[in-house]
């Protein structure tokens, strides 16, 4: 598995570098970054992408009994459901029974998710549902304004719908970040989330939920018990997250 992963990563990296250098400047600048697919040139990122391809190919094998039925798409916050992350016990409890594939990659912005989706094999049969939570890195580590980040989320949702037209999609509002309600990141995330209902309303099979208040106290304060670094959920917060969305996902999946 590791041999496959490294070979895939090196080959793909070389190809992308040459293609990127050959692309006309006008093409590179024609879209805002939040809605234009963009690769990341980190070896671990390619290795993880290769692992996801291998998981899909295994699921697509007619002899394999486990079929992928749920996609969990996002950044490090979703990535932390994986092995050794604070959400691993929660994943096993709630999402392993739903045959979920973790497509969360640490540090990703909306444009990176778009690239990843474009470079995945088709899942057969199509997944029943997907959950999407992305955008915090657009605001806090990118140069996007809240509306631009929201448009990136809209573009990912359109992409998922185009890939699997019958799949139900649950888009989550970006989780709160930083302890205080008046922190600039908090305000930007609140603004970002305010755009999503209108941006998503015309995309088929899409539902929107904002569960951010579940992590806050009555005064809007984000405790380190919920998010120790004021960004990434603790195991307790992962449990709250899973409890909030699993009933809706099960409904979408007909389970």
What is the predicted role of each segment?
Residues 72, 108, 112, 148-155, ...:
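Extracytoplasmic/secreted proteins, especially bacterial periplasmic and envelope-associated proteins
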Residues 96, 165-166, 204:
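Proline-centered flexible-loop/turn and helix-kink motifs
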Residues 176-255:
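Catalytic His-Asp segment of secreted/periplasmic serine-dependent ester chemistry enzymes
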Residues 1-73, 77-88, 92, 252-255:
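N-terminal secretory targeting modules
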Residues 79-90, 94-96, 110-154, 159, ...:
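Oxyanion-hole/transition-state-stabilizing segment in secreted/luminal serine hydrolases
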Residues 34, 40-43, 82-86, 102-109, ...:
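Acidic/histidine-rich helix-loop elements
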Residues 69-74, 99-104, 128-134, 138, ...:
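Structural recognition of the beta-strand scaffold that forms the well-ordered cores
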């Amino acid at each position: 598995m590791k041999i496959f992963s490294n070979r895939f990563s090196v080959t793909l990296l070389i190809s992308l570098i040459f293609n990127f250098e050959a692309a006309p400047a006008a093409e590179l600048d024609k879209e805002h970054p939040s809605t234009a697919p963009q690769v990341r040139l980190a070896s671990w990122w390619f290795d993880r992408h290769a692992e996801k391809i291998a998981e899909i190919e295994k699921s697509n094998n007619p002899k394999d009994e486990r079929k992928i039925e749920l996609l969990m798409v996002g950044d490090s916050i979703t990535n932390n459901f994986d092995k050794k992350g604070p959400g691993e016990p929660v994943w096993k409890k709630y999402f392993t029974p739903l045959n979920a594939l973790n497509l969360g990659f640490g540090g990703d912005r909306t444009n990176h998710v778009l690239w990843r989706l474009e470079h995945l094999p088709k899942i057969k049969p199509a997944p029943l549902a997907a959950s999407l939570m992305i955008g915090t890195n657009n605001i806090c580590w990118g140069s996007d304004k809240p509306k631009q980040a929201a448009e990136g989320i809209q573009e990912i949702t359109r992409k998922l719908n185009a890939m699997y037209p019958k799949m139900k999609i649950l888009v989550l509002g970006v989780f709160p970040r930083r302890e205080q309600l008046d922190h600039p990141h908090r305000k930007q995330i609140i603004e970002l989330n305010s755009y999503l209902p209108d941006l998503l309303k015309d995309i088929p099979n899409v539902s929107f939920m904002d569960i951010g208040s579940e992590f806050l106290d009555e005064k809007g304060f984000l405790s380190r018990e919920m998010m120790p670094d004021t960004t990434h959920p603790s195991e307790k917060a992962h449990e709250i997250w899973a409890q909030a969305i699993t009933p809706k996902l099960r409904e979408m999946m007909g389970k």
